[in-house]
Amino acid sequence: MKRRNFIKRASLTGLGLAVVPTIISCETEDKKDKKAIATATPVLPIVVATWRFHNATKAAWEVLEKGGESIDAIEAGCRIEEADLKNTTVGNGATPDRDGNVTLDASIMSKEGDYGAVVCMENIVHPISVARKVMEETPHVLLAGKGAEQFAVSQGFKRKNLLTKERKKAWEEWKVKSEYKPIINIENHDTIGMLAIDKNGDISGGVTTSGLAYKMAGRVGDSAIIGSGLFIDNTVGGATATGMGEEVLKTVGSFLIVELMRQGSTPQEACEEAVKRIVTSNPNYKNFQVGYVALNKQGEYGSYCIHSGFGISKYQEGKQTYVESGSYVES
């Protein structure tokens, strides 16, 4: 679609802000999903996140409804999951790597296009906050391993052993039967990726994760890599990913989605195309999961995944909802 047509459509959308939500069918080139996703009625602010992270989106919404900026909402929301011991894929109490160490990745991106990230960081509960400090307090974009941990401590963060007794026991059991192979399946992906637009219409995003369960030491997925796990362009919108990070990295998925939206695709269409890029290039796509979420400047959202079971949490107009994503492979 030509840019002038995209602008025209965006203008028409703006004229009907409070009328009806836009309905977008989940459709691929060769088949149509029976589900349909209703994009958000373009009323701001709005926050969306991967999976059923309702507590996280609620915390983010509480910032937004008070007139707070989207970047603050993102940090507040992600911190909720990082501190939750019941969430074994993020922050404190997360599943360790194959050597028994909990290593965390996180990234955050602001309306200005500034970016901060940490990878392979240990002993710090809130990597999303450290990532923001990297963005705001250093000339760098990404810090890794011990360097990231040392920087966090210099910024006032306290060290803490993140490996719980429960996760240590599970790791020890895994070692006996696994032959040191990481668990790779369509369920082993609970990264939280979050996108928010504040009342000023400015968008920010963040991602936080412990990565693939029992991964090789030093493994870095897509979550902290700009353009893969997260990308924001305040003139267009944003996108985030969850799932098999290696596949997202190879297709630079979040950047692809934002660029497709820039060219006129809806968030839903862009997410579907990003998934299609993966399944057409990897014949083993039935053995792993990838899911995308996108949000444009008009407040319209979309999501799509390879396998059913993925969805997004949305908070808007004081209401929390869960929207099941369409999928390439029908259950």
Task: Give, region by region, the residue ranges found by the protein language model.
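Twin-arginine (Tat) signal peptide motif
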Residues: 1-7, 30-31
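A generic alpha-helix preference that emphasizes hydrophobic side chains
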Residues: 3-4, 23, 128, 254
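N-terminal export signals
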Residues: 5-26
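Alpha/propeptide regions of enzymes that mature by internal proteolysis
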Residues: 10-11, 15-16, 31-331
